[in-house]
Amino acid sequence: MNNVNSKIEMRKTTTIIHNYEPGDNEFIERKFSVYNKAYHRLESKGMYYDAEKKDLYLPAGIEQYYIERSFGRDIFHKVGPDKFAKVSGVKLKYTPRDEKQKEAIKFCLGMPPYEKNERASQLQVNLNTGVGKTYVAIVTFAYLSMRTMMITSSLDWIDQWREKIKEYTNLRDDEIYTISGVGSIAKLINGMKDVSKIKFFLCSHSTIKSFAKKYGWDMVSALFRRLEIGVKIYDEAHLWFDNICMIDFFTDVAKTYYLTATPIQSDFFNNRIYQTAFKTVPSIDLFDEDKDPHTSYISMLFNSHPKATDISACSNIYGFDRVKYTEYLTFQENYYKILKILMVMIEQTVSPSGKVLIYIGTNYAIMRTYYWIKYYYPHLSVGLFSSLVPKEDKTKELNNRIILTTTKSAGAALDIQGLEMTIVLNEPFKSQVLTKQTFGRTRAHNTRYIDIVDVGFSTLKHYYASKKPLFKKIATDCVEIQLSDHDINQKLLEIEREERRRLQLIQDRPNLKQVVEITQKAGEGN
């Protein structure tokens, strides 16, 4: 049982409703519920009910109006966080590179004009890709001088964070600790690891979730108290939303930062809950529509001419099936005609050292496309950045000129040096999260994002229309190219003529003509 007499207990990152019985407040329960189409039922999201203790956990970011309206004003405010360790001697090696980083750091530390943030326990840092969220987070850690835990959405990103911490500060390897696996957490809780010198902990969502599943969320609370964590930071905070809520419900640290370039959820109903959970959490977004865009958007509209049977085959009980469509398209003639046009564009407009990232929805479709490119363009290096390649070899694939991938594999936080062009060739989506994520892969100026749209499917036309307003905001310019079958064939004819012209120019060179004549005479002599 809890030691709080009040009905409502407010902590740094959660509001707990004590002595709650399911059904006591249908308004709140519905506000934090989504409909499961597969099982035809409402399921809770963004809240947690402890049936044994009869405690209902809600996000601290929910508007207090809803709490008071639903449960009254018998509120106990927990004044301080759990005990945390102070760290000293952290020195920064670099100053902020621009005004945006300076502004973001002021926001995080509660400096003018953000004085209120000094007392805020939760802050959203919604900075666009390339601004430097990593640097801002590390500077914040250094200034606050509290033991910090970074929680990443992928195990792969932990090493990146470790390297950046060492690059930006004077921390040594032995002052940064990676929590890996359930056994590692058990050792920390049981005091089998001396953490007195550790200043920065790194852990993944999957590790914490696995530990909680085995030992319970109260043990996650015990872990944070044992480590005396003062600050926790979520990287790519739009991912693992359910896990973020649970960690927030069962930890009570001084400061929590949510880093993301896309503070939204793909699903409409999930996003409604996400926005409710962070409604009162201060946020910063320094995107400047006039100065920040650096990539142009080009949409190429074509028609794969699906028959009624094709449209039916690319559907499931819920509607359009993206996986089935992706594989269907690789059997269509116009797909390879469009690919031919794109390959010529790559050869003519991408620099010799530049790279091209191509999104394709499935590994099967990737392989069909890969073999086509290798057959017709054997001189071009092509990499596979997906589950087709062993994890330890994936990074090497990014050294190729053309990289075939999926949105799942080339997700958030991926930085490809020298990327000049992104092509969404055969992976349909309407998600604003994926749109910003894929668009953010190109970091340099004068880069391009090409979106291939099959207008033969009404669903894909709807996807395209729903994303256009966002592209108008984040791109330097937007160009729409409509390609009829006649246009495609004419373009291919022009390409063929140009290839013949170049071949003729090569053959007309004097030294080459001499070699040909000698070869012909040698053949006649035999």
Model-derived segments and spans:
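Conserved two-lobed SF2 helicase motor
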Residues: 195-214, 397-412
